[in-house]
């Protein structure tokens, strides 16, 4: 939960730096080293390329996938059963678009966004679907917040990266 902790103290920039880091210890080191599962720790191989004494199929660092879904993908919950959603993607500039959906008992939640450049401005566009019998708090990267009910919503705001 390191990435969540960094976000809670206002250091989303540091969370993204850690996410993108490919030196060990990091998540991308595992990918660059050929990993297709989560390892028990981030230092799976020593400097000579020999595997350490650990599990190469272990969820110890799996919280990164959840963080990506909630922070990059923008879909989170504010109440049990996804009856009150939090739609709050937090782009870092390296990722220019995301499309996520999640099936709940009330229906499918959709959060799709992209960043385009227009006249030297970065325009963040969001499309989201809030299922029936559900409410959502939509938090845009420019700081504006919208409390909405079921429906389909589109927003465009200028952001700095």
Regions found by a protein language model. Name each.
Residues 2-3:
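Conserved small-residue packing positions in alpha-helical repeats and bundles
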Residues 13-161:
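Non-catalytic C-terminal accessory modules of carbohydrate-active enzymes
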């Amino acid at each position: 939960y390191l990435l969540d902790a960094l976000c809670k103290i206002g250091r989303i920039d540091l969370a993204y730096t850690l996410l993108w880091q490919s030196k060990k210890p990091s998540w991308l080191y595992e990918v660059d080293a050929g990993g297709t599962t989560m390892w028990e720790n981030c230092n799976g191989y020593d400097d000579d390329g020999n595997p350490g004494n650990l599990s190469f199929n272990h969820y110890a660092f799996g919280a990164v996938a959840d963080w990506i879904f909630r922070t990059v993908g923008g879909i989170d919950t504010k109440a049990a059963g996804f009856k009150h959603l939090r739609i709050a993607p937090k782009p870092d500039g390296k990722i220019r678009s995301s499309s996520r959906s999640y099936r709940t008992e009330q229906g499918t939640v959709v959060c799709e966004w992209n960043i385009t450049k227009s006249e030297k401005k970065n325009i963040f566009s969001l499309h989201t679907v809030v299922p029936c019998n559900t409410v959502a708090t939509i938090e845009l990267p420019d700081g504006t917040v919208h409390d909405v009910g079921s429906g389909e919503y589109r927003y465009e705001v200028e952001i700095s990266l």
